[in-house]
Amino acid sequence: GALFLLQGCGAAVKQCADPQLDIPETIIPGGYADTLCLADLEWSEIFSDPLLKDLIEKTLKNNRDMLTAAARVRELERLHRVVRADQFPSFNARGYLDQENYQYTDAAPVKDNEFGLKAGVSWEVDFFGRLRWANRGAIAQYLGSIESQRAMQMTLVAAVATAYFELAALDNELDIVLRTRDTWRENVKQARLRFEGGLTTEIPYQQAQVEYASTAALVPDLQRDIAIKEHEIALLAGEFPSSVERSRLNTHDRFPDLMHVGVPSELLQRRPDLLAAGQALKAAMADVGVAWANRFPRLEISFTAGVENNTFTHFFTGPYWYPVLNLTSPLFAFGKNKARYQASIEAYNQERYQYEQKVLEVFKEVNDAVSSYSSAREKVSLMGNLQDASRKYVELALFQYQNGYISYMDVLDAQRSYFNAEIDYSNSVRDEFLAIIGLYKALGGGWSVPEEESETSGK
């Protein structure tokens, strides 16, 4: 069925078609609904690291894009008040004192004083719904700004968490490289002694030097990447470049299996960017209603009452009042109003297509995130096995070398394999963290609107 039904279209928006989408029962084809969903948890429940929690809270408080989004919400809330006030009568008052001096031929100058005080009220009778549609549009823009702010929050939480775990992984990789570099340095010393003692040829010695030099060359690049990542996090947190306090990457902790492959499609209603797109669609529909109403007459009723006299002592002896019925109607504008109405319909169609595209993109993002998460969980397990096997391989190679069964080149190969396995395992743990972040973001986790708040917003 249609994603949602547009309410109260009437004659004004009868050409506004609903989004044409047939939403599947589950996000993953052939999947099933799961009662325990990652999106049901707040971000503070997902990321237990206290340093990361503090960093996220600081980012949500100080990030300039976040502050801009909050200011936009406040702006549109005030603008909605302006538009809503147009539906009610407006009251005004005016007091005045005029004096005119004039002279006819040779006669004495004449002074004409005029004192007045009047109050009035005016009200536009909204026969064709122009003001009501404008109010609906302002409400939609305001609610859309709230959802956009939530989307910004969701994006920032994901961005900070991603950068934090990438930084921790770089720290861990640097530790591995430094430890391996020291191992290769010791290997160079031993290989040189064996070569100079005539126990081996020069080849193992040169090979050990190559391994040491290539490993040492990785250090400056990693140190640079760490500094750049710290600068990125500082920018997200609304600060100047500085060092970032962080924990070590825990390669032993694993995320629990918080979700299965079948996630109910209703969870996509959590996505604030999708909800913002829905509000933009409602605002475009309201613009159609305003353009339709502008093709018809406007009726304004006003009433003015006051007192006026030319002497202050008799000021209250000259009361007056009068009503005014003002009817303004477009007569002949060479099709301008009709063209504006038709243009607003096409603007609505653009928003509708963009909304449909956004829904498709959201389904794709969630499918991609689920695939990435499943793959990352499997890979980190396999990389852990590879690291364990590589460690045992090094131990066995050293034992066999010491007993004369293999050459020193075989030991170097085993140590090189173990080094690569350590790096790959560290990166796979990082990728699992990033995958859970991506899935959490794709599901719109942590930013669902309470039911009571949703009902209030719709009134």
Pin down the residues of each PLM region.
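Periplasmic alpha-helical coiled-coil/stalk elements that build and connect Gram-negative outer-membrane
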Residues: 131, 140, 147-263, 372, ...
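Short segments within alpha-helical structural elements
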Residues: 185, 213-242, 376, 384-443
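Terminal intrinsically disordered/low-complexity segments used for targeting and assembly
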Residues: 1-61, 139, 223-269, 442-459
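Short flexible linkers and secondary-structure junctions
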Residues: 10-161, 298-303, 324, 334-341, ...
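Sec/SRP-type N-terminal targeting helices
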Residues: 67-68, 84-85, 125-153, 203, ...
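Short sequence motifs at beta-strands and strand-loop junctions characteristic
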Residues: 109-113, 317-319, 420
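Outer-membrane beta-barrel pore domains and translocons
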Residues: 94-100, 122-124, 170, 211, ...
